[in-house]
């Protein structure tokens, strides 16, 4: 007994006419008749009483109709449950990311997600950490990748990604380039190039200088790492950045110097997740791929 046979049987029972039933299930009348006959042969009893003018259910047919309708309803419910999940994954996944987040190969991650869920639209927003945190908390973003932060009032979940030291970048002709280390006190009065205060590396740098008890001057503020590195190349200032910035092609030729003294400067990145609401199905799927990629 096959589901298709039950569908054919129910169509004939409801239409009480083989031609109309065949049109309803989009098969030929001969094909429908053959399907019903095969079902009757399997059950070893007639299901319909046929005349030239009418088609009526037999007692066995009436008994089968109740169970057939129940079976087909269960199959539809199962399909709808799966379709509901697939429907959510056909929606939109809003992802926020700060530039050059450590411990994350976002293009590869999003490519894997797109391959696994090709009908889901990915909306990627590149913003500063503070804005990303607000976006997740307010529901504008499903998930974000940013610097580790703990702003007042934030009650979300942070899943650590990476932790790395921060280094000073300067042009080869700068006075600090003569050594691979520099005391915090030596940095007082130096013009710095840094990100907007909304960005994670800027927050980490500000915290490091506060911890060291050194006041610094941010001469130029940027919103992208490429501009920052170009300005350092042009000797318009130095920069305190996450170590992986120094390995970028645009940083080639710059000198990396490790600050030392009252504590060390570190940059930490994390996945920003909501706490007040459940993760969206898309965000859960992305997190699963991230764990597979990082082995965590």
Located regions from the model:
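A late-sequence structural motif
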Residues: 255-296
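Hydrophobic hinge/microswitch elements
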Residues: 128-141, 147, 198-257
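Flexible hinge/capping segments at coil-to-helix
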Residues: 155-192
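Short helix-boundary/capping micro-motifs
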Residues: 12-31
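Conserved amphipathic alpha-helical core elements
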Residues: 39-40, 113
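Central regulatory/effector-binding core of bacterial HTH transcription factors
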Residues: 90-152, 222
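A short LG(V/I)-centered, amphipathic sequence patch enriched
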Residues: 40-62
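Secondary-structure junction motif
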Residues: 147, 176-177, 182-183, 191-212, ...
């Amino acid at each position: 007994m096959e589901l298709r046979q039950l569908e054919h049987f129910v169509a004939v029972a409801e239409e009480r006419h083989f031609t109309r039933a065949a049109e309803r299930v989009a098969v030929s009348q001969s094909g429908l008749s053959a399907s019903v006959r095969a079902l009757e042969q399997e059950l070893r009893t007639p299901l319909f009483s046929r005349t030239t003018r009418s088609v009526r259910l037999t007692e066995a047919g009436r008994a089968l109709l109740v169970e057939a309708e129940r079976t087909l309803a269960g199959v539809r419910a199962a399909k709808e449950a799966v379709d509901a999940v697939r429907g959510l994954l056909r929606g939109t996944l809003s992802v926020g990311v700060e530039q050059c987040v450590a411990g994350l190969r976002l293009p590869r991650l999003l490519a894997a997600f797109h391959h696994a869920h090709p009908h889901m639209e990915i909306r990627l927003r590149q913003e500063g950490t503070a804005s990303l945190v607000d976006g997740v908390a307010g529901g504008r973003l499903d998930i974000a990748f940013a610097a580790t932060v703990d702003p007042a009032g934030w009650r979300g979940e942070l899943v650590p990604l990476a932790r790395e030291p921060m280094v000073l970048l300067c042009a080869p002709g700068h006075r600090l380039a003569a050594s691979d280390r520099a005391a915090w006190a030596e940095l007082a009065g130096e013009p710095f190039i840094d990100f907007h205060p909304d960005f994670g590396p800027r927050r980490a740098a500000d915290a490091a200088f506060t911890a060291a008890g050194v006041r610094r001057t941010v001469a130029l503020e940027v919103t992208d790492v490429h501009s920052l590195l170009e300005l350092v190349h042009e000797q318009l200032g130095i920069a305190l950045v996450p170590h992986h910035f120094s390995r970028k092609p645009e940083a080639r030729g710059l000198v990396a110097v490790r600050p030392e003294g009252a504590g060390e400067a570190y940059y930490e990145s994390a996945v920003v997740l909501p706490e007040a609401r459940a993760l969206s199905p898309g965000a859960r799927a992305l997190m699963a791929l991230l764990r597979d990629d990082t082995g965590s």
